[in-house]
Structure formats: structure tokens, C-alpha cells
Amino acid sequence: MLVISAGKNEIFDFALPMGVGLVDMAINLTKFLQKRSCVGADEKSINLKNIDPRYLAKIEAKFANSSNPELQNLSQNLSKNPGQNLYQMPEKIVFVGSAGLYKDGEILQIYESSVGANVEISSIENRSYSPIECEISSIVSRGTIKTNSSNFITTDKNLAYKMFEKGYFLENMEFFSVLKVAQIFKIPAYGIFVATNFCDENAHADFIKNHSAAKELLTRYVKENM
């Protein structure tokens, strides 16, 4: 099992930071999984003992020498247990992080989700459309809660309610990318979220106010249930 987070202000001792937002998360998670598959943790289950250790060292060095500080931190975390973490494809991916509530729900409550979307506010107002897939369901079911992802945080309560009417319960910046990458690699994935705010004019202030308590709650939940 691979547990990941966005990183920056959401660092956990049990999760690898992969990047904030849709783009960084997609790039870094893809790089991470691709390096594992290149090592040989594919359907053929190549025996790692037969692989030249110098080749494995080169792969790990690419993480350490990256200009991306999150990948450098990831390399340091991997070195604690390289046999388990670096050279095997995970049986599932669990993303942990904070989320906003569109309408219903409670602050500092834990929610699990295995359905992610990338629906922009402009499409709710019929000002845009997308010709590509905008919603993904993981091959592992974790309830019916749908999580929408965007690089922009919703701060208009009326628009947030419209998102809720469309079936979306949570807002998190990275989750859609996690599910999309996991889908490509055919890995089950789901998210564990703690609500820090409602998506309204107080979204940022409430996020700041509740974030420390949210991280503690999420840490306790993960360590007690996983």
C-alpha cells in the first residue's frame, strides 16, 4: 500500500508528499510509479536480487538530485525502507488530505471517497464544456461521496451549492489526478479526507484556523484504521 499526500503544509510521517494541485500531483505520482515499473515490479514479478544494484542506485539518485524539493524529501523517506517502498508497485494507493465542503457535512469530520471529478465552476454556469473525461470511479469502492478537484478554491456559497446539486460533496485540489494516474497503472485508489472548511467567503480563513486540528485528526484516524 502506498499512502501519499500533497505535501507542503500537509506533511505526515506515514505519507509520501507528491505535489500540490492537479498538475504537480499527476507528474510526480506518474514519475514515481514509472520508476517502480522500470525496476521490474510488473506482471512478470522480476526478482530484484538479480538486478544490478548500480542500476537501482541510479534510479534512487534521480529522486535525490531532482530540483523538486518534494521529490528530494520523498527520496529521504524512501531510504528508510527502500526494499518495500521503491522497488515494488503498490497494491493500492491511499491519498490523505484536507477538503472543503460544498454544502452538507461537518468541519473536522473524516470522509472517504473513491470517485473524483474535475468540474470547473464555469461549466456549472454553462460558460464552458470539456470534451474529455471529467469523472473517474476507482476500481475499489469507498462509499458514494464524490470529490471534485480544481486548482481553484470555490469561495462562492451559491456556486458551491450548485456543485452539491450536481452530486459533489467535497472539494480537494489533487484527488482527480491521483485517481487518473492510478487508473492508468491499474491500481486501486481512494482518498481519506478531513473537512477543514465550507466552500464560501470564509473558506481560506476557516482552513487556516482548522488545519492543525485537522492534521491531528487525520493522523489519528489513519494510524487507528490502516
Regions found by a protein language model. Name each.
Residues 34-89, 122-123, 127:
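Intrinsically disordered, low-complexity terminal tails and inter-domain linkers enriched
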Residues 1-2:
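Extreme N-terminal starter segment of soluble prokaryotic enzymes
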Residues 10-37, 52, 86-226:
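Glycine-rich phosphate- or other oxyanion-binding loops that anchor nucleotides, phosphorylated ligands
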